[in-house]
Amino acid sequence: GCCRFPCPDSCRSLCC
């Protein structure tokens, strides 16, 4: 699954 919005910097490269 993807990160929540707004997504944290640590997840931004994964799904944002």
From Swiss-Prot:
Location in the cell reads: Secreted
Kindly state the tissue distribution recorded for this protein. Expressed by the venom duct.
According to the UniProt record, which cysteines are disulfide-bonded? 2-11, 3-15, 7-16
Q: Any one cellular component term from GO for this entry? A: extracellular region
Keywords of this entry: Disulfide bond, Secreted, Toxin
Domain of life of the native organism: Eukaryota
Q: In the record, what terms sit under GO molecular function?
A: toxin activity
Q: What is known of its domains?
A: The cysteine framework is III (CC-C-C-CC).
Q: Which family does it belong to?
A: Belongs to the conotoxin M superfamily.
Q: What is this protein's name?
A: Conotoxin nt3a
